[in-house]
Swiss-Prot record:
It comes from the Bacteria. GO terms for cellular component: plasma membrane-derived thylakoid membrane. InterPro entries: Cyt_b/b6_C, Cyt_b/b6_C_sf, Cyt_b6/f_cplx_suIV, Cytochrome_b_C_euk/bac. The keyword Transit peptide does not apply. One of its GO terms (biological process) is photosynthetic electron transport chain. One of its GO terms (molecular function) is ubiquinol-cytochrome-c reductase activity. It is found in: Cellular thylakoid membrane. The 4 large subunits of the cytochrome b6-f complex are cytochrome b6, subunit IV (17 kDa polypeptide, PetD), cytochrome f and the Rieske protein, while the 4 small subunits are PetG, PetL, PetM and PetN. The complex functions as a dimer. Belongs to the cytochrome b family. PetD subfamily. This is Cytochrome b6-f complex subunit 4. PROSITE patterns: CYTB_CTER.
């Protein structure tokens, strides 16, 4: 018994579907029972085995007890909030810092109207979007690194 069903190209119904661009899943390996009964449980049990194995072989150690009277000099947020924290820390007016953060999604919403190109076209043929996203990526990395440094070195990253 074969696991793959070969298409019968002499079938007029299949040829009509193929002529319309349909019928591509008329043949092939069925999802039931092959995937749902055999492959999915193996992947699920393998994932559980990896998690349990890592938990047994390398358990997470508990750190020191929290002391509310011994706080660090500067409390940092989680790593994914470093760029936002840096904007709020560097901009002198906090309302201006929040306004700068609202300009980011507004600019991304306006971007498709500035560059009127087919959305399915090659991304390398969309220069405005490429420049905006690359600038945003590098600015986010720059602000994230700067948030880890003291405030007097945060804008220059301690290089100047």
């Amino acid at each position: 018994m074969s696991t793959l069903k070969k298409p019968d190209l002499s079938d007029p119904k299949l040829r009509a579907k193929l002529a319309k661009g349909m019928g591509h899943n008329y043949y092939g390996e069925p999802a039931w029972p092959n995937d749902l009964l055999y492959i999915f449980p193996v992947v699920i049990l393998g994932t559980i085995a990896c998690v349990v194995g890592l938990a047994v072989l390398d358990p997470a150690m508990l750190g020191d007890k929290a002391n509310p009277f011994a706080t660090p000099l500067e409390i940092l947020p989680e790593w994914y909030l470093y760029p936002v924290f840096q904007i709020l820390r560097v901009v002198p007016n906090k309302l201006l810092g929040i306004a700068l953060q609202t300009l980011i999604p507004l600019g991304l919403m306006i971007l498709p109207f500035i560059e009127n190109v087919n959305k399915f076209s090659n991304p390398f043929r969309r220069p405005v979007a490429m420049v905006v996203f690359l600038f945003g990526t590098f600015l986010t990395i720059y602000l994230g690194i700067g948030a880890c440094l003291p405030i007097d070195k945060s804008l220059t990253l301690g290089l100047f």
